[in-house]
């Protein structure tokens, strides 16, 4: 050590360089040792090119691996192509079908709900969004067949992305709840619109019934023209404005001659005194007007007819009255009589003068009535019900505000009306699941309506409160194993109906829709016109007679209409036992015979006890039989009114003829 110290003291630079060299050699040795003893990584984190998800893969497969999220292969060359051939790109049998139904090996996971305001779970909501996006990005193979191809593609997506059973039950329950609210809203809207129409009609009629002043003036002018014609007919060729003129006799000849002459003399003196009060030029004008009118009677009749027609046109359709039309007809008849007299100047018959005088008198009377009665009668109109569709019949609307049913207010926001808050259905699972379904008796009102309104299919005699208008409108449910009750069946049990059938639902029928609304059948109109029913001559036995006891079958009996109007369609299931099928056939035949006998007995009993007329509803619009129809139903009200008008005209004609003969 002493020698080394002496050497370093004699050469300090060499000692420093030697120390640095030793340190460098030691560091290099350590680095080489670490490189030699380095352990290669077993896994590495890679990023998917397609879905951008990070995945941990073995280190050797960092450029050839399948993404577990999108199932796409990631292995590329420098030019961007795949680094190996992929047969699944061009071989169909190597691809598996993509479906939203979870595989059986996946563990059952609890439902994840987005929020309390969304009916669908997170998975079903994502599937709905996917369907919408795929439909939006759809490109047809042929542009001319776009509609057909997109319908097929939509059906394919519906089959691929089906809703889970809880979501399907929730959607059906929500649709039912929404239909109830919208039905009540529509009913309230129709009732308020009817009240508004009635109020508007009353205000409009009160303002429009009063005739305008021009119409009243024209009616008065027509009456004055007819009165002038009547006076010219009474005076004849004489002139009342001459100094020695007298009034026509007011009493018929053959009575007390002295009293009649005294009365005529007093009237002539009074008329002369009245003419003396008028100035001379006024008397001359009256004389000229009288002479002109007496020589132009046909023109005055034409002017009166035109005046009546103009008054009717100015009055309009609302103010048109029967008396105006009758007055116009009388003016037309009077014009025809004057024209006939004008063309028969050589030999004018005596009956023509009598008929002309009678018509003029009647026209004067009718014209005076039309001129005085300036307001149309505003009596209460008889309500004419209208036919409403989509389930809201006119008989549902109350006829008075006191009978109105309280409905939700329409003044609220549109979102709360047409998108109501979905009711909670998960707490309902605590209630009793299995309830005994109600069996409707064939003798009850739904059974009778189902038997009368059947169109050839078997109607279920239970309520189908599933939110659909017809029982066949709901989609067919999937077959479930025995002992398994779905959530949709549970909601159908809560609404007092049968569980969803494992078989496809039948076609929509009117009878099932009638049976679905059995609680309000007395206040609804049928959904189909009676002219289109096919009842094959059966009587519509909706209500039993007072002395008839309701026939309620046992729980093992099923309803079957008689006379073969309906046929039983048994579901086509696999045959298990021939003896069981034979026994079932015998039971069905016995039920058919028993129900037929019961129906014929009820029909015969009702025919004996009922004294009212029965109406047979057929496939055509024939009413009741002619033997039971009263005579008042055959005679229309218009015919009765016409007979009354003819009787009034004949009476007035004979009265005018009598007056004319008496005055002459």
Curated annotation (Swiss-Prot):
<dbReference type="GO" id="GO:0010761">
    <property type="term" value="P:fibroblast migration"/>
</dbReference>
<feature type="topological domain" description="Perinuclear space">
    <location>
        <begin position="236"/>
        <end position="297"/>
    </location>
</feature>
<feature type="compositionally biased region" description="Low complexity">
    <location>
        <begin position="245"/>
        <end position="261"/>
    </location>
</feature>
<dbReference type="InterPro" id="IPR018861">
    <property type="entry name" value="TMEM201_C"/>
</dbReference>
<feature type="transmembrane region" description="Helical">
    <location>
        <begin position="215"/>
        <end position="235"/>
    </location>
</feature>
<keyword id="KW-0037">Angiogenesis</keyword>
<feature type="modified residue" description="Phosphoserine">
    <location>
        <position position="477"/>
    </location>
</feature>
<comment type="function">
    <text>Critical regulator of angiogenesis and endothelial cell (EC) migration. Promotes the migration of endothelial cells, which is essential for angiogenesis. Interacts with the linker of nucleoskeleton and cytoskeleton (LINC) complex, which plays a vital role in connecting the cell's cytoskeleton to the nuclear envelope. This interaction is essential for maintaining cellular structure and facilitating the movement of endothelial cells, which is critical for proper vascular development. Involved in nuclear movement during fibroblast polarization and migration.</text>
</comment>
<feature type="modified residue" description="Phosphoserine">
    <location>
        <position position="450"/>
    </location>
</feature>
<feature type="topological domain" description="Nuclear">
    <location>
        <begin position="319"/>
        <end position="322"/>
    </location>
</feature>
<keyword id="KW-0597">Phosphoprotein</keyword>
<dbReference type="GO" id="GO:0031965">
    <property type="term" value="C:nuclear membrane"/>
</dbReference>
<keyword id="KW-0539">Nucleus</keyword>
<feature type="compositionally biased region" description="Low complexity">
    <location>
        <begin position="508"/>
        <end position="520"/>
    </location>
</feature>
<keyword id="KW-0472">Membrane</keyword>
<feature type="compositionally biased region" description="Polar residues">
    <location>
        <begin position="610"/>
        <end position="628"/>
    </location>
</feature>
<feature type="modified residue" description="N-acetylmethionine">
    <location>
        <position position="1"/>
    </location>
</feature>
<keyword id="KW-1133">Transmembrane helix</keyword>
<feature type="transmembrane region" description="Helical">
    <location>
        <begin position="298"/>
        <end position="318"/>
    </location>
</feature>
<feature type="modified residue" description="Phosphoserine">
    <location>
        <position position="466"/>
    </location>
</feature>
<feature type="modified residue" description="Phosphoserine">
    <location>
        <position position="480"/>
    </location>
</feature>
<comment type="subunit">
    <text>Isoform 2 interacts with EMD. Isoform 3 interacts with SUN2 and LMNA. May bind to Ran GTPase; has a greater affinity for Ran-GTP over Ran-GDP.</text>
</comment>
<feature type="compositionally biased region" description="Basic and acidic residues">
    <location>
        <begin position="595"/>
        <end position="608"/>
    </location>
</feature>
<dbReference type="GO" id="GO:0010595">
    <property type="term" value="P:positive regulation of endothelial cell migration"/>
</dbReference>
<feature type="transmembrane region" description="Helical">
    <location>
        <begin position="323"/>
        <end position="343"/>
    </location>
</feature>
<feature type="topological domain" description="Perinuclear space">
    <location>
        <position position="664"/>
    </location>
</feature>
<feature type="transmembrane region" description="Helical">
    <location>
        <begin position="357"/>
        <end position="374"/>
    </location>
</feature>
<feature type="modified residue" description="Phosphoserine">
    <location>
        <position position="441"/>
    </location>
</feature>
<feature type="region of interest" description="Disordered">
    <location>
        <begin position="245"/>
        <end position="264"/>
    </location>
</feature>
<keyword id="KW-0007">Acetylation</keyword>
<dbReference type="Pfam" id="PF10476">
    <property type="entry name" value="DUF2448"/>
</dbReference>
<feature type="compositionally biased region" description="Basic and acidic residues">
    <location>
        <begin position="578"/>
        <end position="587"/>
    </location>
</feature>
<dbReference type="GO" id="GO:0005637">
    <property type="term" value="C:nuclear inner membrane"/>
</dbReference>
<keyword id="KW-0812">Transmembrane</keyword>
<dbReference type="GO" id="GO:0007097">
    <property type="term" value="P:nuclear migration"/>
</dbReference>
<dbReference type="GO" id="GO:0001525">
    <property type="term" value="P:angiogenesis"/>
</dbReference>
<protein>
    <recommendedName>
        <fullName>Transmembrane protein 201</fullName>
    </recommendedName>
</protein>
<feature type="transmembrane region" description="Helical">
    <location>
        <begin position="643"/>
        <end position="663"/>
    </location>
</feature>
<feature type="modified residue" description="Phosphoserine">
    <location>
        <position position="444"/>
    </location>
</feature>
<dbReference type="GO" id="GO:0005521">
    <property type="term" value="F:lamin binding"/>
</dbReference>
<dbReference type="InterPro" id="IPR040041">
    <property type="entry name" value="TMEM201"/>
</dbReference>
<dbReference type="Pfam" id="PF09779">
    <property type="entry name" value="Ima1_N"/>
</dbReference>
